[in-house]
């Protein structure tokens, strides 16, 4: 992988690449020759199966300090992350993660966020 600071125009950040939709989107973007960086809580779980040329960085949308390096130089971000916590904590964690990501993306100058909503 390369350093997040090596980002150039057209860089895409993909969150949720270890999930069903994210994994397929990663493959499709890579097949189209897109430059893709993936944010993962456990990068080792993704790095071994990511297509060649994919940059995998550690981060968590609930930990704001991990987002700025991942978003550096990104043009478009795909937000495919949703909390799977049980009970009342689910909604608050999901909101907090999305809010953190949106604020960090705005600060980083990300031009477009594609948000996948999958729950009722």
Tell what function each PLM region has.
Residues 44-108, 119-120:
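NAD(P)H-binding glycine-rich loop region in Rossmannoid oxidoreductase-like domains
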Residues 2-34:
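N-terminal Rossmann NAD(P)H-binding glycine-rich loop of SDR-like oxidoreductase domains
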Residues 11, 75-76, 112:
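Structural motif
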Residues 34-41:
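Conserved glycine-rich Rossmann-like NAD(P)H-binding loop of the short-chain dehydrogenase/reductase
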Residues 16, 40, 61:
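Conserved residues at beta->alpha junctions
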Residues 16, 81, 114-118:
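Active-site beta-alpha turn of Rossmann-fold NAD(P)-dependent dehydrogenases/reductases
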């Amino acid at each position: 992988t390369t350093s997040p600071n090596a980002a150039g125009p057209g860089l895409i950040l993909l969150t949720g690449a270890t999930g069903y939709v994210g994994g397929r989107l990663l493959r499709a973007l890579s097949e189209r020759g897109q430059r893709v960086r993936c944010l993962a809580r456990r990068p080792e779980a993704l790095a071994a199966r990511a297509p060649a040329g994919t940059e995998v960085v550690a981060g968590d949308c609930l930990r704001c300090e991990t987002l700025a390096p991942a978003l550096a130089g990104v043009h478009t971000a795909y937000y495919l992350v949703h909390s799977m916590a049980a009970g009342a904590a689910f909604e608050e964690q999901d909101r907090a993660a999305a809010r953190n990501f949106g604020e960090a993306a705005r600060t980083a100058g990300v031009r477009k966020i594609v948000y996948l909503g999958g729950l009722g």
